[in-house]
């Protein structure tokens, strides 16, 4: 995708040059000066953290979500270079419970622990925030199941 954008920029730059070189001399600034400041690779707006969280909570709260969409969402969420907010994890756990996907709940919690990496304070914080949901839904953590000792 980036390669295609760079090719478009290169083609656009070569079409602005005529057979005798650039259309404008170097002494007189013209449209070429404005073109140089355009970033050909950046487009679209950045998603804020709140919009990101809302998008994923909405995704997992869909009433007609099926097991495949649930796993696809979890896999996509895990690929991001961040630990999801507890409210996203809460929505995902509730979707797992609606679909009776207990294995996915354990997988989500294991992924959160893995994504926390060397930051040992993140996973306990997430579990603390999710404890009411875990108790309500009857979900055990991997540690409670003894999976951390395997």
UniProtKB/Swiss-Prot annotation:
The keyword Zinc does not apply. One of its GO terms (biological process) is mitochondrial electron transport, cytochrome c to oxygen. Pfam families: COX5A (PF02284). One of its GO terms (molecular function) is metal ion binding. In response to mitochondrial stress, the precursor protein is ubiquitinated by the SIFI complex in the cytoplasm before mitochondrial import, leading to its degradation. Within the SIFI complex, UBR4 initiates ubiquitin chain that are further elongated or branched by KCMF1. The modification N6-acetyllysine is found at residues 87, 113. A motif (SIFI-degron) lies at residues 2-17. It is a peripheral membrane protein. The modification Phosphothreonine is found at residue 141. Coiled coil: none annotated. Pathway: Energy metabolism; oxidative phosphorylation. It is found in: Mitochondrion inner membrane. One of its GO terms (cellular component) is respiratory chain complex IV. Residues 1-41 form a transit peptide. Keywords: Acetylation, Heme, Iron, Membrane, Metal-binding, Mitochondrion, Mitochondrion inner membrane, Phosphoprotein, Transit peptide, Ubl conjugation. Belongs to the cytochrome c oxidase subunit 5A family. Component of the cytochrome c oxidase (complex IV, CIV), a multisubunit enzyme composed of 14 subunits. The complex is composed of a catalytic core of 3 subunits MT-CO1, MT-CO2 and MT-CO3, encoded in the mitochondrial DNA, and 11 supernumerary subunits COX4I, COX5A, COX5B, COX6A, COX6B, COX6C, COX7A, COX7B, COX7C, COX8 and NDUFA4, which are encoded in the nuclear genome. Component of the cytochrome c oxidase, the last enzyme in the mitochondrial electron transport chain which drives oxidative phosphorylation. The respiratory chain contains 3 multisubunit complexes succinate dehydrogenase (complex II, CII), ubiquinol-cytochrome c oxidoreductase (cytochrome b-c1 complex, complex III, CIII) and cytochrome c oxidase (complex IV, CIV), that cooperate to transfer electrons derived from NADH and succinate to molecular oxygen, creating an electrochemical gradient over the inner membrane that drives transmembrane transport and the ATP synthase. This is Cytochrome c oxidase subunit 5A, mitochondrial. It comes from Gorilla gorilla gorilla (Western lowland gorilla).
């Amino acid at each position: 995708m980036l390669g295609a954008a760079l090719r478009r920029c290169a083609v656009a730059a070569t079409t602005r040059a005529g057979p005798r070189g650039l259309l404008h001399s170097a002494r007189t600034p013209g449209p070429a000066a404005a073109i140089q400041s355009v970033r050909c690779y950046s487009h679209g707006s950045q998603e804020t953290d709140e919009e990101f969280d809302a998008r994923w909570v909405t995704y997992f709260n869909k009433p007609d979500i099926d097991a495949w969409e649930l796993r696809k969402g979890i896999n996509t969420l895990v690929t991001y270079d961040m630990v999801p907010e507890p409210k996203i994890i809460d929505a995902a756990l509730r979707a797992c419970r609606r679909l009776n996907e207990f294995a996915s709940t354990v997988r989500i919690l294991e992924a959160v622990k893995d994504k926390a990496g060397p930051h040992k304070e993140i996973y306990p914080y997430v579990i603390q925030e999710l404890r009411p949901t875990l108790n309500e839904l009857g979900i055990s953590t991997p540690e409670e199941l003894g999976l951390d000792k395997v």
